[in-house]
């Protein structure tokens, strides 16, 4: 399989684990918080949905508009695996940037899932149809430890971010006080 096939498979895989983790939850389960400073399933799902569109726009409006610079490829070698590892490590907490912070008034399950599915479909369609080489366009991640990423790695970041917060949803569901129904 090509790199693009791998990216699509990863996006489809993270979509499935997220949908499986949120399937069939009651309103009480959806809004349950293990502690006042912890996110509910609703807040995690909304953050995933908002982030998907935000990062996709960053890829299409900023990363892909940077001039192709194949000479920069050495800067990002080995970061594919690093992105996946870093994002799945839940021992390192991060604070969501204000536009992606769901704490105001969480969306309903239907709203979050609809937004997520629409955004994910656009991301997958872009990967399948763009004629540009995703490995030739670069943009710096705001977290210095991550640094410069190519467009392909930004796509991996979308999927890894979904998986990270799906793990967070599973943590919420594993809480002993999580409603039985």
Where are the regions that the model predicts?
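Acidic/histidine-rich alpha-helical segments that form the ligand environment
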Residues: 10, 80-134
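Short N-terminal segments immediately surrounding and downstream of signal-peptide cleavage
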Residues: 1-16
């Amino acid at each position: 399989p090509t790199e693009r096939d791998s990216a699509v498979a990863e996006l489809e895989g993270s979509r499935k684990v997220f949908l499986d983790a949120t399937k069939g939850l009651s309103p009480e389960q959806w809004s349950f918080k293990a502690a006042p400073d912890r996110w509910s399933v609703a807040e995690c799902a909304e953050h995933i949905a908002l982030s998907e569109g935000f990062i996709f726009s960053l890829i299409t409006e900023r990363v892909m508009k940077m001039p192709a610079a194949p000479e920069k490829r050495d800067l990002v070698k080995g970061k594919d695996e690093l992105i996946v590892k870093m994002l799945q490590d839940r021992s390192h907490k991060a604070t969501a940037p204000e536009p992606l912070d769901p704490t105001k008034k969480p969306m309903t399950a239907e709203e979050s899932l609809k937004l997520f599915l629409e955004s994910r479909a656009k991301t997958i369609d872009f990967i399948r149809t763009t004629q540009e080489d995703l490995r030739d366009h670069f943009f710096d991640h705001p977290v210095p430890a991550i640094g410069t990423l190519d467009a392909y790695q930004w796509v991996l970041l979308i999927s890894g971010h979904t998986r990270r917060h799906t793990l967070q949803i599973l943590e919420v569901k594993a809480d002993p006080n999580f409603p039985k129904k």
